[in-house]
Regions:
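N-terminal Rossmann NAD(P)H-binding glycine-rich loop of SDR-like oxidoreductase domains
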Residues: 3-27, 32
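NAD(P)H-binding glycine-rich loop region in Rossmannoid oxidoreductase-like domains
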Residues: 36-37, 47-102
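Conserved Rossmann-fold NAD(P)-dependent oxidoreductase catalytic core, especially the SDR/UDP-sugar
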Residues: 81, 90-153
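A conserved pocket-lining segment of Rossmann-fold NAD(P)-dependent short-chain dehydrogenase/reductase
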Residues: 146-151, 193-194, 200-226, 233
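Active-site Tyr-X1-5-Lys
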Residues: 149-179
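Glycine/proline-rich active-site loop of Rossmann-fold NAD(P)-dependent oxidoreductases
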Residues: 173-176, 189-201, 234-245, 338
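Mid/C-terminal beta-alpha module of Rossmann-like enzyme folds, strongest
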Residues: 230-294, 312, 323-338
């Protein structure tokens, strides 16, 4: 009988990639949705990723409510806790933190009560980064972001607090359930549907000509397929117990992303911006456009993380950032989203 895996947040970009990867490996998958009307869309998205949806089932639960989580984990050997607020205006700071922290603790408590063997939780590289963007260099999993650092944006604070709360909870429980956490960078790559694309919207906006100029910012890019792969590796590897794993990739400036799209997407990339904005221009724009304020603090910074641990312990080898960006752009075009 195939092992059963619960994946939280089945409507999400990363969760769908994890579900598809699990189904392709023969696992039985149960995923959570808040809205029962989303079940058909999730199944269709997973099937578009060339995975059979025959072993996929659903449970309707909410990260902000206690009800239903014991039933959600029942019979599951593993849990991939992927669901989380994205940030960048997705919710108020208080809602973001409550969803991230409260939701994670609900999932973990249910997993412990239900005798789940392993929980793999999606955190973020932002939970293992210098407090400010003023420092550069390469950091690893031993670094924790200070959640009380002045000026820390709500998304970074929520991800850090949620992961800290998860580790504190598991340390105090002393049960047989084990925890591993995955800390991804900016998640791009092919899409499986036309909805819930927050992670790749910057690529779509560039292709649609909605970004007039390119700020001097960059991302450590991880492919959603590779991110799903590292979740599955951490799920079954005995050496992953009690460990954090950074899952970042190559750093690309936004100007390099634009160049890659123009080179790989042909005429459909005609609207990709070529104008590069000065730091001063971005800061001036940020004075009247709140959505640019989080970008302004990162101008010119190249914070990087080491993935040596994931390579050594899990044998994880991500694909190149340029391949990921190109595949993301072509996928958005195929879905008529750009």
């Amino acid at each position: 009988m195939a092992d059963k895996v619960l994946v939280t947040g089945g409507t999400g970009y990363v969760a769908r990639a994890c579900i598809a990867a699990l189904l392709e490996k023969g696992y039985e998958v149960r995923t959570t949705v808040r809205d029962p009307g989303k079940r058909a869309a999730v199944r269709a998205a997973v099937e578009s990723g060339a995975a059979s949806g025959g072993k996929l089932s659903f449970v309707v639960v909410d990260l902000l409510a206690d009800a239903g989580w014991d039933e959600a984990v029942q019979g599951c050997r593993y849990v991939l806790h992927v669901a989380s607020p994205l940030g960048l205006g997705a919710a108020t700071p208080e809602q973001m933190i409550e969803t991230a922290c409260g939701g994670s603790l609900r999932v973990l408590a249910a997993a412990v009560r239900g005798g789940v063997e392993r929980v793999v939780m999606t955190s973020a590289a932002n939970a293992s980064s210098p407090d400010s963007y003023e420092e550069e260099g390469v950091t690893d999993e031993t670094l924790w972001t200070d959640p009380d650092a002045p000026g820390l944006i709500p998304y970074r604070r929520s991800k850090t607090l949620a992961e800290k709360a998860a580790w504190d909870f598991m340390q105090n429980k002393g049960d047989t359930t084990t925890l591993s956490t995955i800390l991804p960078g900016a998640v791009f790559g092919p899409v499986l549907s036309a909805d819930n694309l927050n992670s790749v919207q910057v690529i779509g906006r560039m292709l649609r000509g909605e970004i007039a100029g390119i700020p001097r910012i960059g991302f450590e890019i991880v492919d959603v397929r590779d991110l799903a792969d590292i979740h599955l590796r951490a799920m079954v590897a005995s050496a992953a117990v009690g460990e954090r794993f950074l899952a970042t990739g190559e750093f690309m400036w936004m100007s390099e992303i634009a160049e890659t799209l123009r080179a790989s997407c042909g005429p459909q990339a005609a609207k990709v911006p070529t104008l590069e904005l000065s730091d001063q221009q971005v800061r001036q724009l940020a004075e009247t456009r709140p959505e640019l304020r989080e970008i302004a603090v990162a101008l010119g910074r190249k914070n990087r993380h080491s993935i040596e641990k994931a390579r050594r312990v899990l044998g994880w080898i991500p694909r190149s950032a340029r391949e990921t960006v190109a595949d993301c752009g072509r996928s958005l075009i195929e879905w008529r989203l750009a």
